[in-house]
Amino acid sequence: IAWSNDDMPELGGDTTLEQCLSEASQAGFIGIESGGKFPKKSEELIPKLNEFNLNLCSGWYGANLRTNSVNEEKNLIQDQLKLFKDCNSPCMVFAEVSGSIQGDPNRKLSTRPQMDLEESKKYYEKISEMGKYLEDEGMPLAYHHHMGTVIETEEDTVRLLENTDDSVKLTLDTGHMLFAQGDSLKILKDFSERLIHMHC
């Protein structure tokens, strides 16, 4: 994300993957998240990462569990799951994008999707089942609260963690939490055992 942005491709759109990996390595990073410019096949991605002495530390998966069944989502995640397992990624950054305003500059943040109590309960059951599945696959689900999505605020994030199985872990994004006027330190204190990945 420091070199190019999948939500806004015009940010760093002309930055090559090689420049991104080279500069990340030179800066002292030993791991990097996948992005839109990264190869989607392990036989292509692994040599590219090795060339710059980098490991795959995670990457974004945009889910549609609000509209898909768990089995449908399991089928859709298979290619990325295989890629991440082949690359020995420690987790998968997982976010709900159904109805999200991402990629649509004409939509206001205030129009983001929201769930009523009935839908929330069903969603927590689905995400718990998905968390257990990915845990069994050795690829923990690290849920990313994100601006413009159904899980955006501190309240959304707390409610998600309080109502889902412990297999649903957390990607704490301090920038998104600040933007949503939430308290990252409180999340860290209250849910430290669920936190496995961070964006700062």
Regions found by a protein language model. Give the residues of each.
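N-terminal pre-domain/capping segments
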Residues: I1-P90, E129, E135-M139, D166-K169
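Short, solvent-exposed beta-strand-terminating loops
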Residues: W3-D6, A95-S100, C200
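A short, acidic/glycine-rich surface segment
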Residues: D7-P9, I101, A180-G182
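Short beta->alpha connector loops
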Residues: G35-K40, G148-T149, G175-L178, G182-D183
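Alpha-helical scaffolding within the catalytic cores
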Residues: K40-E44, E155, S184
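Short, surface-exposed basic-aromatic patches at helix termini and helix-loop junctions that form
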Residues: I46-N53, V158-D165, L188-S192
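Active-site acidic/histidine proton-transfer and metal-coordination neighborhood
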Residues: N71-L172, F179
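Aromatic-lined glycan-binding groove of carbohydrate-active enzymes
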Residues: D183-C200
